[in-house]
């Protein structure tokens, strides 16, 4: 057990952690050169395409250190993006240490900082590593000072390496062995194993990645899942070298997989504890905090007969993604679908792309909304995540919107733009600290403004240099109203949105104009209105297509033309009473894109 090291890598997007992990695998001979592939651990197509890590993965490597001993390194890959912080906290819970990888050219970023604090809170040993020293703009001295200044850990003797060229990778391995403590645990105590991650394999059923804290798990053991109390038999246990490799037993301190032929997707929830069915442990391990979705959106299949497939796809995906929440929803405009809760906008995009790709679904998503706290005149408090569930204005005593604390790290020269953006988004400044060339600003911002397009705007005003990390702090009273879109007097539920009263005029006009371009002309006039309660704040009309009825009159009397025009008018009026308007899918998507 003294020769085991469990660690993960904390790094910002693009600071090179997936490349570094490739090098570690190569040096330790986990894969032959032929099987080596760039970013081995990012196995999803989507991960490779966007160059980000979404799912936590694990690898067990054998490393012969300079002291002649062979160490077993269990490396758990973590995502770097703020939306996946939950995946990160899970990965860290299984480790004793973490490598903080920082790009020697760019320096520390907000999300790295957030994940690093998570690691320090969990009492992990954090070892700084400066990567990309082969780049011409690398400045390891400055970055080392920045790490000490901003993060507050010793970085003078940080290992300098370049994962791309392979310089310094051996030193990284030596540092892992020297600086990260071996796991603690009692091999003779009853089994306690933490489920770090689980996913569904079409052939094997549920595969769970576990970290054995105490005791050991052998192939063929009967074990019990502590939260559900169900017993299963371990058909296969083993490790990833990144390939699945079977073993007869997982010992204390090791990280590996367990397959028990579970077909029930929720049979092994992430963060749960496994113990043996006979003489098991008394109490479960402390898991992770359950995350609450922050952003909700309605998602509907484009053709209604896809609904069943959509439901199965969501069930399979939610096994893989413990933070996904969904419930059925129906809309008069879009039919049946689901209301899905996400951790943030990137998470939302990724989930939608995965559904479309991995399950061949065609989906349409309504505008994302956050959860509002509504105090009714009757005195009860309700939580609303769907604008069309909002009670009537006269029943609402007060609406409270979620406020987040956003920590932004930005180079000095872009500070002005960032502050302007935060003020426009109704933010209040809480703190500002200068660290060398970087400024750390803290703002309290309404979450609704952050989920819409804050991140993109932040990146564009700062030329991509600013980085953002945010978390929910409280609900604050705010003057929020529901903006409805009426088409020929009928409310379209899928287009409703909750916005601040100061924005309604501007937003209403923009929406109505956009809808006017997108709704195809019919045989009768279509009135598009934006309303708050019963008050109409903007309107435009899609003009009717009409035949030139007077074309056949040659010269002739004006009363003859009048008669024909009036007859046409009557007809159009009748059509308007019975006709209904199809709102095309583009119109819904346009509402999402309104802010751009």
Curated annotation (Swiss-Prot):
GO BP terms: positive regulation of translation
Q: Which GO terms describe its molecular function?
A: GTP binding; GTPase activity; guanosine tetraphosphate binding; ribosome binding; translation elongation factor activity
Q: What is this protein called?
A: Elongation factor 4
According to UniProt, the reaction catalysed is: GTP + H2O = GDP + phosphate + H(+)
UniProt xrefs under PROSITE patterns: G_TR_1 (PS00301), G_TR_2 (PS51722)
Cellular location(s):
Cell inner membrane
Keywords (A to Z) from UniProt: Cell inner membrane, Cell membrane, GTP-binding, Hydrolase, Membrane, Nucleotide-binding, Protein biosynthesis
Q: What is its main location?
A: membrane
Q: What class of enzyme is it?
A: hydrolase
**Which species is the source of this protein?**
Shewanella baltica (strain OS195)
CDD domains cross-referenced by the UniProt entry: EF4_II (cd03699), EF4_III (cd16260), LepA (cd01890), lepA_C (cd03709)
User: Do you know which Pfam families this protein is assigned to?
Assistant: EFG_C, GTP_EFTU, GTP_EFTU_D2, LepA_C
Briefly state the protein's biological role.
Required for accurate and efficient protein synthesis under certain stress conditions. May act as a fidelity factor of the translation reaction, by catalyzing a one-codon backward translocation of tRNAs on improperly translocated ribosomes. Back-translocation proceeds from a post-translocation (POST) complex to a pre-translocation (PRE) complex, thus giving elongation factor G a second chance to translocate the tRNAs correctly. Binds to ribosomes in a GTP-dependent manner.
Which residues bind GTP per the record?
A: 14-19, 131-134
Protein family (similarity comment): Belongs to the TRAFAC class translation factor GTPase superfamily. Classic translation factor GTPase family. LepA subfamily.
Source organism, top-level taxon: Bacteria
The protein's topology relative to the membrane is:
Peripheral membrane protein
> Per the record, what is one GO cellular component?
plasma membrane
Domain tr-type G, by residue range, is: 2-184
């Amino acid at each position: 057990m003294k020769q085991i090291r469990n660690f993960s890598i904390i790094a910002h997007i693009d600071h090179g952690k997936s490349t570094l992990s490739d090098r570690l695998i190569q040096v330790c001979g986990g894969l032959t050169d032929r099987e080596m592939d760039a970013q081995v651990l990012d196995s999803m197509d989507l991960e490779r395409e966007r160059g980000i890590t979404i799912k936590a993965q694990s690898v067990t490597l054998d490393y012969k250190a300079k002291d002649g001993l062979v160490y077993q390194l269990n490396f758990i890959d973590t995502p770097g993006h703020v939306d996946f912080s939950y995946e990160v906290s899970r990965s860290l819970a299984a480790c004793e240490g973490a490598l903080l990888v920082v790009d020697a050219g760019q320096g520390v970023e907000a999300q790295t900082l957030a994940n690093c604090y998570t690691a320090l809170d969990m009492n992990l040993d954090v070892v700084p590593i400066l990567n990309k020293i082969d780049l011409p703009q690398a400045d390891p001295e400055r970055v080392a000072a920045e790490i000490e200044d901003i993060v507050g850990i010793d970085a003078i003797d940080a290992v300098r390496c370049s994962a791309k060229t392979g310089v310094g990778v051996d030193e990284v391995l030596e540092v892992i062995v020297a600086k990260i403590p071996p796991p603690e645990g009692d091999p003779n105590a009853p089994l306690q194993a933490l489920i770090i991650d689980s996913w569904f394999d079409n052939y094997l059923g549920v595969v769970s990645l576990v970290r054995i804290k105490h005791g050991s798990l052998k192939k063929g053991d009967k074990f019990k899942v502590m939260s559900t109390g169900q017993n299963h038999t371990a058909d296969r246990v083993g490790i990833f070298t990144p390939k699945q490799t079977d073993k007869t037993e997982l010992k204390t301190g090791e990280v590996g997989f367990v397959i028990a032929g579970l077909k029930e997707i929720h049979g092994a929830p992430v963060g749960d504890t496994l113990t043996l069915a006979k003489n098991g442990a008394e109490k479960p391990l402390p898991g992770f905090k359950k995350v609450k979705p922050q952003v909700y959106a309605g998602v509907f299949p484009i053709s209604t007969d896809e609904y069943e497939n959509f439901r199965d796809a969501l069930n399979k995906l939610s096994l893989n993604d413990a933070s996904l929440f969904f419930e059925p929803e129906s809309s008069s405009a879009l039919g049946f679908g689901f209301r899905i809760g996400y951790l943030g906008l990137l998470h939302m995009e990724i989930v939608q792309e995965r559904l479309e790709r991995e399950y061949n679904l065609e989906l349409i998503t309504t505008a994302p909304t956050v959860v509002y706290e509504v105090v009714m005149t009757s005195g009860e408090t309700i939580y609303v995540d769907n604008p069309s569930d909002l009670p009537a204005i006269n029943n609402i005593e007060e609406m409270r919107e979620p406020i987040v604390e956003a920590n932004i790290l930005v180079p000095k020269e872009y500070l002005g733009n960032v502050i302007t953006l935060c003020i426009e988004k109704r933010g209040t400044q809480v703190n500002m600290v200068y660290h060398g060339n970087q400024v750390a600003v803290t703002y309290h911002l309404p979450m609704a403004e952050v989920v819409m397009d804050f991140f993109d705007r932040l990146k564009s005003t700062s030329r991509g240099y600013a980085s953002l990390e945010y978390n929910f702090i409280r609900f604050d009273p705010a003057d929020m109203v529901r903006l409805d879109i009426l088409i020929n007097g009928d409310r379209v539920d899928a287009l409703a949105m909750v916005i601040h009263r100061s924005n309604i005029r501007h937003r209403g006009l923009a929406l109505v104009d956009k809808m006017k371009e997108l709704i195809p002309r019919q045989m009768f006039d279509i009135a598009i209105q934006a309303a708050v309660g019963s008050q109409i704040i903007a309107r435009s009309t899609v003009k009717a297509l009409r035949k030139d009825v007077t074309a056949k009159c040659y010269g002739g009397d004006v009363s003859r033309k009048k008669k024909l025009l009036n007859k046409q008018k009557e007809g159009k009026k009748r059509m308007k009473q019975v006709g209904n308007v199809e709102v095309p899918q583009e119109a819904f998507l346009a509402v999402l894109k309104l802010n751009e």
